[in-house]
Amino acid sequence: LEAVSHASDTHYGYGDSAAKEIGGDVLKHAEMVHTGLKEYKDVDKXGPVAKELSGLPSGPSAGSGPPPSALFAQIHQGESITHALKHVADDEKTHKNPADKAQSGPVRXGPKPFSASKPGISPSPKPVTKKWRXENXENVSNLVIDDTELKSVNSTLQIKXXINSISVDNYKVPXISINKXDGRHIYLSKNSLDCEIVSAKSSEMNVLIPTEGGDFNEFPVPEQXKXIWNGQK
């Protein structure tokens, strides 16, 4: 506080000398500064900081609780601390008076947990025009497409993603297209020996041709092709 007071007195001296030399509006500003410093000094002399430094009491602190010794004395009472509790009669108890419990209003239950429904399984896919659609099938070993017509012509059966096996009966297959497949076995009947097999980005493919005895002869499909330029193509 003494340092602040000394600095303000020094500013008074320099401010007065500068104001006299310059004059004009500077005198008005100097008077405003002097007034502000005077008010600061008046407040500083009677403020809480000055009282603390001078040793004067600054007033009791609000909300002061009982001393810690009284709290520990209550804790060490043990079972006798319950003697101060008031006895509650039966007619004042809520669980023995259903009427009072009903007046308190219904208890709101929280939202029920959401349970996602599992996708259904369509054991018999329905045809869409000339295409059959099988979806949401899991662990189904007897998936059969039976809603068909005999002697179908210009029909297309397209299968995407993974599949274990597929059988096509009573159809003459003119072409089989396989793309991005690994480990495929194609069984051809006697009526489909003239079909064309087109494969791309596939490996481990075998074509099985029926024999007179009912068995099949296995022929691998080449995974690599050799191209030779003959001068024109």
UniProtKB/Swiss-Prot annotation:
Residues annotated with Phosphoserine modification: S17, S104, S115, S122, S124
UniProt signal peptide: none
Keyword Phosphoprotein among UniProt keywords: yes
Keywords (A to Z) from UniProt: Actin-binding, Cell membrane, Isopeptide bond, Membrane, Methylation, Phosphoprotein, Ubl conjugation
Residues the record lists as Phosphotyrosine modifications: Y14
InterPro entries listed in its UniProt record: Adenylate_cyclase-assoc_CAP (IPR001837), Adenylate_cyclase-assoc_CAP_C (IPR013912), CAP/MinC_C (IPR016098), CAP_C_sf (IPR036223)
Sequence position, cross-link Glycyl lysine isopeptide (Lys-Gly) (interchain with G-Cter in SUMO1): K151
Major site of localization recorded for this protein: membrane
Pfam families in UniProt: CAP_C (PF08603)
GO molecular function: actin binding; adenylate cyclase binding
One GO-annotated biological process of the protein: actin filament organization
Function: Directly regulates filament dynamics and has been implicated in a number of complex developmental and morphological processes, including mRNA localization and the establishment of cell polarity.
Protein name, per record: Adenylyl cyclase-associated protein 1
Species: Sus scrofa
